[in-house]
Amino acid sequence: MATVTVGTARVHYDIEGAGAGPALLLVHGTGAGGAVLTWGQVGPRFAGDRRVITLDLSGADRTVDDGGPLSVEMLAAQVIAVIEDAGTGPVDLLGFSMGAPVSAAVAALRPDLVERLVLVAGWAYTDGDEYMRNLFTLWQRLGGSDPEGFGRSVTMTGFSRGFLNGIGREGVEALVPNLPPTPGTLRHVALDLAVDIRALLPRITARTLVVGGTQDITVPVENSRELHAAIAGSAYAEIDAGHVMFFEKEDEFVKTVTGFLGS
């Protein structure tokens, strides 16, 4: 584990693998669990022939800062600092959910640091999308008054109906406590409500793959299609799964990403 200081934040990150190719940096989504909770299962599958970097953004468990409001640009600065501190050269950059707009901002602001870009279940803006605005507002309300309700809402929207029915009641009940509404998670939710990277998207020059989940009811797939349309020359793929598609369809997700990164 390594750390780098960015403003008031001491950002924790890990490097796994020893491959000679471009490193792959994975940027997590909303949640205080950060890198461990998001990438613990699928991350090692990318480490066979490359180095894989995971980090905890402000609001996640291992990174400590002043607890103030977050912005896309602030978190992008943390990703940039990790790339530079790790000394791996330009990286392939993959962002999931909240991590997708953050990763897109990194690619737009520092094109010299990004070889290829993968945006998974991401979106360009929240204000104007009444579905997502209301969902994130609901999470804020539940986070302040009903932690179990928060966990159930996140579980219900994070996975497809078929997946939830497939794992059954015991499996679903085990998922509910996995994303508690900690202060850090609620800082992420506040950021989710404020996302607007539309002005940055035309500046992205890295080869880009956008991946949407056809059954995503956290960030509906239309948002991924809009990202693809806004990034010149980007490739696009859909996986028939809910928001956390790498949990529901791990093999297909890994094949989709490695197929793009190896091309």
Predicted regions: what is each one?
Residues I204, V210-G212, D216:
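Short beta-strand/loop motif that positions the catalytic acidic residue
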Residues G128-E130, E148-L200:
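Conserved alpha/beta-hydrolase catalytic His-Asp/Glu region
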Residues G95, G99, S103:
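Gly/Ala-rich beta-loop-alpha elbow adjacent to hydrolase catalytic centers
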Residues I217-N223:
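Conserved alpha/beta-hydrolase "acid-adjacent" motif
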Residues P44, I53-L94:
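Active-site loop/oxyanion-hole signature of alpha/beta-hydrolase fold enzymes
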Residues A104, A108, E115-G144, G184:
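Flexible "cap/lid" loop of the alpha/beta hydrolase fold
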Residues A241-V254:
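Catalytic histidine-centered segment of alpha/beta-hydrolase-like enzymes
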Residues V6-V64:
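Conserved HGGG/HGGXW glycine-rich cap/lid loop of the alpha/beta-hydrolase fold
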